[in-house]
Amino acid sequence: MARREPIAFDAEVQRFFQFLVDSYGMAGPEYSELLLPGVLYERPELRVWVFLQAGDGAGTQIDVDVCLPNRDWPAKAELRDLVEAAVFAPRHRVAHKAHTPDAARKTLDENATWLRRLMPLLLGPDVEALMRKANERQVDCAGNPKKRGPDVKWKFD
């Protein structure tokens, strides 16, 4: 059996997220390992971070965070919450697994697809409302997430 080489995280992120530079004029990629391996893309009104989180109980995973800089409130949301807030799909449909090189590439590819779909909203006039909705956590009295109503019509489900 052939030995599998680990992925070069920054190179793989660049391969899948290059559309941010080509189509949206974002600066980057800028690689950092301050706390977690991460790749940053940015423009004055928007930042996108792609992180590799290793060693937690869920195994290695990839997270994509979107931030609106220069706001007087914490304008940051995870990709999976933005996908649900935009009524594209339930948050659990956004991939995050990276336990193998193939799983990491699949997750990066799917995350890039979700971000492509979100970019018009993230650069649109209602971006702050979308970010606030993505950060709303409706929970029951025990702290569990409340179920969505049965009438939700997902755009990409």
Q: What are these model-derived regions, one by one?
A:
Residues 1-16, 28-157:
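Intrinsically disordered, low-complexity regulatory regions enriched in serine/threonine/proline
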